């Protein structure tokens, strides 16, 4: 019984914990990485891939043992510290459709609270190169 409790506590079984604690420290830290993202705009027929920098990586998080009612617990995520925006003109947009698209370029990253206005903090978000124009539309 004790080895089972110990393994559950330490996260040694992959059925309960996806990563053992020692493995979590081998994940890449929160840092800038180069990433291809797909730019698209309603009314324009194609997506256009561009290379940009994004924040990606692991942030150490903790969950309090004692839960205090009505208190907020914030998990840190890898997010932008500084960023600027670039503008790109999509090719092949029909007349009357503004072809300009603005996208963020990360300059530095940190582990902090998620800012929903600049980051996607969902559990599983769309991939950066996802393109709505690639999905067939059925009437």
Swiss-Prot record:
Cell compartments where the protein resides: Secreted
Annotated Gene3D superfamilies: Cystine-knot cytokines
Keyword Disulfide bond: yes
Pfam family for this entry, one: Cys_knot
TM annotation in the entry: none
Disulphide bridges, residue numbers: 30-78, 44-93, 47-131, 55-109, 59-111, 114-121
SMART domains assigned to the protein according to its UniProt record, in alphabetical order: GHB
GO biological process: G protein-coupled receptor signaling pathway; ovulation
PANTHER family: GLYCOPROTEIN HORMONE BETA CHAIN, LUTROPIN SUBUNIT BETA
Function text: Involved in gametogenesis and steroidogenesis.
Protein name according to UniProt: Gonadotropin subunit beta-2
Gene: cgbb
């Amino acid at each position: 019984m004790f080895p089972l409790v110990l393994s559950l506590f330490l996260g040694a079984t992959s059925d309960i914990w996806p990563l053992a604690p020692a493995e979590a420290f081998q994940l890449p830290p929160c840092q800038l990485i180069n990433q291809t993202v797909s730019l698209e705009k309603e009314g324009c027929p194609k997506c256009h891939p561009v290379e940009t920098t994004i924040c990606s990586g692991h942030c150490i998080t903790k969950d309090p043992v004692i839960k205090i009612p009505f208190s907020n617990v914030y998990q840190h995520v890898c997010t932008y510290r500084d960023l600027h925006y670039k503008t790109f003109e999509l090719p092949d947009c029909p007349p009357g459709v503004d072809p300009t698209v603005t996208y963020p370029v990360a300059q530095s990253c940190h582990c902090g609270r998620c800012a929903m206005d600049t980051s996607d903090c969902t559990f599983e978000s769309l991939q950066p190169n996802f393109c709505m124009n690639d999905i067939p539309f059925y009437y």
